[in-house]
């Protein structure tokens, strides 16, 4: 109890004992309430020593406040006691617990407003056009670009030349810069003078277009008013730093000359990128053994340098990415369908062209060939000697089904000969329906004769004897009675030739 009682001493303890528990109540806070609060905090796994300071009380209130909606009356009483103790530590004059809660809400509300105003101020300061900064007197002054930024820009141009990634590099380093700073960055480049000359031509064209679309006002300017910027003023050749700052930061109709000049530079950089990257997106094709990931990297790097709108680039991606892939990847990509994402494509084509993919393709090809030749050898390997090639489907002698031979048949093995069904011999030695030759041997299975035998039986060319006799009888019926001896004349020998 001594440790708990040491939370408040002296005048703070006197102020604590003058606060009522409820408005209009006679009961007031006592030392026993501090002891009870300490024990409750230990029960809730909180540190009771936090009650000794105002900051500790705020931490306890922040931790207990989320549980008030679903907490018990004991938790609500603990939270009220800590609020009153927080007011005592801060020496706020309160009369009861309700006033302490109202005081806490007022203080927390004012803190939130101050934090919001501070964030708004910092956001406005961050939104100012750096390197245009405000000095102590509130005037807008220019802060020169740092040597580190120039060094990073020069090193990027030397290493990357004018690859597509040089454009976002320029945009990042020249953020908020005025025309004077941008010209400093361009003058720091030692090489690539031909490319810089192309850039200057683009800047001159854009300056002429600006003068055409923004003609200067007719007549003299009012006193104290600065002139409107021309194309050469935006390029920084005929304007000073103070004029550029004034055009950018003036309250009425500001003109961000630095941002406009950056857009002109980007147009020139796009032409330079196209000049240094002459490869067309149509020429980017995946090699036979090139991984799909490397092909995608080359494709998008070239697409980045293309001078086209985003809609055209999307069409190129949807069409050419699949069309220029190698046959293996193209077959996989077409099976995914037209709505597949790039992530799905890269996952599906992962490993294509490598040893694992080659082994899988070879295994699939062998499985297909084995399925076509299921049941044994082809007819070419089954022929023996001069026997003709067997055509048609293969038929099993064991079960009688087509598509496999008896060697690979899964049906139970049939006993005996597969042709006649008798036991004691095999089908190749079966004599059922066979004819023996003059040596007493049977013809080979299949019914065909050896190669040195005539494969087809010989048929006589003369007409049969029955047809000859029948023809002579018909001829006798047609003859007259005078021909008693038809065989005695020459006509019987030569027919109608006499």
Swiss-Prot record:
A zinc finger (CCHC-type) spans 394-411, 415-432. A motif (Nuclear export signal) lies at residues 16-22. Residues 187-225 are annotated as: Interaction with host PPIA/CYPA and NUP153. A motif (LYPX(n)L motif) lies at residues 484-493. Residues 12-19 are annotated as: Interaction with host AP3D1. The modification Asymmetric dimethylarginine is found at residue 413. InterPro entries: Gag_p24_C (IPR045345), Lentvrl_matrix_N (IPR000071), Matrix_HIV/RSV_N (IPR012344), Primate_lentivir_Gag_pol-like (IPR050195), Retrov_capsid_C (IPR008916), Retrov_capsid_N (IPR008919), Retrovr_matrix (IPR010999), Znf_CCHC (IPR001878). The keyword S-adenosyl-L-methionine does not apply. Disulfide bonds: none annotated. The record marks 130-131, 362-363, 381-382, 437-438, 453-454 as: Cleavage. Residues 73-77 are annotated as: Interaction with membrane phosphatidylinositol 4,5-bisphosphate. Belongs to the primate lentivirus group gag polyprotein family. Late-budding domains (L domains) are short sequence motifs essential for viral particle budding. They recruit proteins of the host ESCRT machinery (Endosomal Sorting Complex Required for Transport) or ESCRT-associated proteins. p6-gag contains two L domains: a PTAP/PSAP motif, which interacts with the UEV domain of TSG101 and a LYPX(n)L motif which interacts with PDCD6IP/AIP1. This is Gag polyprotein.
């Amino acid at each position: 109890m001594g440790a708990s009682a040491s939370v408040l001493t002296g005048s703070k303890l006197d102020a604590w004992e003058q606060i009522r528990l409820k408005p209009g109540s006679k009961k007031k806070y006592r030392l026993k309430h501090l002891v009870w609060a300490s024990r409750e905090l230990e029960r809730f796994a909180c540190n009771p020593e936090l009650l000794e300071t105002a900051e500790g009380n705020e931490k306890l209130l922040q931790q207990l406040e989320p549980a008030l909606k679903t907490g018990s009356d004991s938790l609500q009483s603990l939270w009220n006691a800590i609020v009153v103790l927080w007011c005592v530590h801060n020496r706020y004059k309160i009369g009861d617990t309700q006033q302490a809660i109202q005081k806490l809400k007022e203080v927390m509300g004012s803190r939130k407003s101050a934090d919001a105003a501070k964030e708004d101020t910092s956001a406005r300061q961050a939104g100012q056009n750096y390197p245009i900064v405000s000095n102590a007197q509130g005037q807008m002054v220019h802060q020169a670009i740092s040597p580190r930024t120039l060094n990073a820009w020069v090193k990027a141009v030397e290493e990357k030349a004018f690859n597509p990634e040089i454009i976002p590099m320029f945009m990042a380093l020249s953020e908020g810069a005025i025309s004077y700073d941008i010209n400093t960055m361009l003058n720091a480049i030692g090489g690539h003078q031909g490319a810089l000359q192309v850039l200057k031509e683009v800047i001159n064209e854009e300056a002429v277009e600006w003068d055409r679309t923004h003609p200067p006002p007719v007549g003299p300017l009012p006193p104290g008013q600065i002139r409107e910027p021309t194309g050469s003023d935006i390029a920084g050749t005929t304007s000073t730093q103070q004029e550029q700052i004034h055009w950018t930061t003036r309250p009425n109709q500001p003109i961000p000359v630095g941002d406009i000049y950056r857009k002109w530079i980007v147009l020139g950089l796009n032409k330079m990128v196209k000049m240094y990257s002459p490869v067309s997106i149509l020429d980017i094709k995946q090699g036979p053994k090139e991984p799909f990931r490397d092909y995608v990297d080359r494709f998008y790097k070239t697409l980045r340098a293309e001078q086209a709108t985003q809609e055209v680039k999307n069409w190129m991606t949807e069409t050419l990415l699949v069309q220029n892939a190698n046959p293996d990847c193209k077959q996989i990509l077409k099976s995914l369908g037209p709505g597949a994402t790039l992530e799905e494509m890269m996952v599906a084509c992962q490993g294509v062209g490598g040893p694992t993919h080659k082994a899988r393709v070879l295994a699939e090809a062998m499985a297909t060939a084995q399925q076509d030749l299921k049941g044994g050898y082809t007819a070419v390997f089954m022929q023996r000697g001069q026997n003709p090639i067997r055509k048609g489907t293969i038929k099993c002698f064991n079960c009688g089904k087509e598509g496999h031979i008896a060697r690979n048949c899964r049906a139970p093995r049939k006993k005996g000969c597969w042709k006649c069904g008798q036991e004691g011999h095999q089908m190749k030695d079966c004599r059922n329906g066979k004819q023996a030759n003059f040596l007493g041997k049977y013809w080979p299975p299949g019914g065909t004769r050896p190669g040195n035998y005539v494969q087809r039986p010989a048929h006589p060319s003369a007409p049969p004897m029955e047809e000859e006799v029948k023809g002579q009888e018909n001829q006798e019926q047609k003859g007259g009675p005078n021909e008693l001896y038809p065989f005695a004349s020459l006509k019987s020998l030569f027919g109608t030739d006499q």
